[in-house]
Amino acid sequence: DCDERPTNALTKIVPYLEWDTDYQITTDISSGNNEKFNDWSSQKQFTPNITINQPYLTDSGLNLPMKEGDTYFFKPGLGTGKTTWLIDELKKLHQYRKYALGKINNLLFQFIAKTDGDFCHYQEHDGYILKKDDNTNFALCINSLIHFDSEDFDGSIIIIDEVMSVLKQLYSPFLGSRRNTVIRLFEEAIRRAAIVICLDGTLTDNAVEFIKELRGKDKNYYSVLNEHKPNRFNITILQTTDTNSGKILMNEMSGVIKQILSHDEPVFITATSQKNCETLDRMATSEGKKVIRLDSTTSPNECMKRFLSNPSEYIEQEKPDLVIISPSGGEGLDIPIKDYFVAGYHIGNCLNADDNYQMIARLRDPSVPRYLWVSHKSFIVDNDNKNTESWHDLWLDKVANLRDDLGALSCEDAKEAYRERIINYLDSPHSTLEPKLNWISKFEMNHLRDCLILMLQKAGHNVKFGEINNCKETKQEIKETKETIIQEEVTGIFNSEDIPDTVGKRWRTTVRD
């Protein structure tokens, strides 16, 4: 494996179990005696009632009834053809209207392309007109649920790929003032559907129990686990050290950026920060390299839609030196191209372990060596100093906040309405799922690298450790490039047209909520 790695890049490569204590997860964690890590691990469990071990779901002989009242939970291995299998199954169920719900459009665009016209995107394809046609199947972000009525979901099939991300989005502040409406319509869609299909490579019992609570006890439930572990990657976790002193530099990524730019052959990069993606793009472009970058600023353009519809074909046609993917393309994106990239890199300094794990697997080719630079904790951490030893603490916080809000009201009618809202929340499955998901995310962000390594090892990947030296010149170039990008953004905002008061008020409401 070492012969395939970039030369003059790594000063040390050793198996993970031989890491010294500066790098290795502490003994009490790795031996399973750490209570917090045990709690975290238990929250990630998935309990199937059907277990298979097949390289591809399409060849598994999996024979499921797919009848009204059924709910299916699939935890497939990465690269086992779950989308192809799902589309084949949906074609057999032509008598039902179908809704594919997602968190972000990028995954939905790729799904639509694979269905060969069986689905349309609500925002892109005049959904407000087509929704009157019962034969039209929709793919939509959960944000767009507000454009539907509860009755629209009667007797339909609801498909939720990457269901864990969708559930997290339900409690996200980004839904703003629409949050309660989105949650209500999501609940109605799950309750009213004839069949519900949920899929996720990181699916947990928490999500399963939540959907069951919404669906009711009179339904049939099937939880399917594919134990096959394809695409075992050779992964090197990179740790930056000072060139002169040998001191470990915990959050220094200059050496990784320098190594990425030193390649003469194509490389694939994922990064959890859009700003890092754009910075790397500019630095590579200034050296004459051709770059494909997918992030929130580029995904709406037509080129990126072509990329999403068939990534391998687009890469073969455009022949980029670098492909850079941000979290916008980190979930569900399937890039099966083989023998094109010589290395894959991941720069993980934001988000939680689940999100980082998903991004690493976007490039399917197992022959490509992977290099991960991951900070010990996420740069975006909620440092509220509250006691969050377990998800129960977050639940207590939520209840206390609701109680405080109630006490601040003066009108008796308002108090009664809010009291009823509190009771409804505490009686709902949201009161359990929301604090659990929040606690898991917070824990992973505070122990990002350790959690990610444990997840990669559990998935069967070959994990090693490598040191890489820092580079002061590259660090300075990164700093200057980011400053230029920020200055351009500020100038663009300054020169933009004034926002109407109505839009500004709506934006403030969204941010506040």
Q: Which stretches of residues belong to each language-model region?
A:
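Conserved helicase ATPase motor motifs in RecA-like P-loop NTPase domains
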Residues: 74-80, 105, 181-211, 348, ...
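Interdomain hinge/linker at the junction between the two RecA-like core domains of SF2 helicases
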Residues: 205-260
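Conserved SF2 helicase motif VI
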Residues: 341-370
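Conserved strand-helix element at the start of the C-terminal RecA-like helicase core
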Residues: 96-108, 203-207, 250-284
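SF2 helicase catalytic motif II
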Residues: 151-198
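Replication-associated primase and helicase/ATPase modules
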Residues: 1-70, 91-92
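Inter-Walker segment of RecA-like/P-loop motor cores
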Residues: 115-152, 306-309
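Long, low-complexity intrinsically disordered regions enriched in Ser/Thr/Pro/Gly
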Residues: 296, 367-513
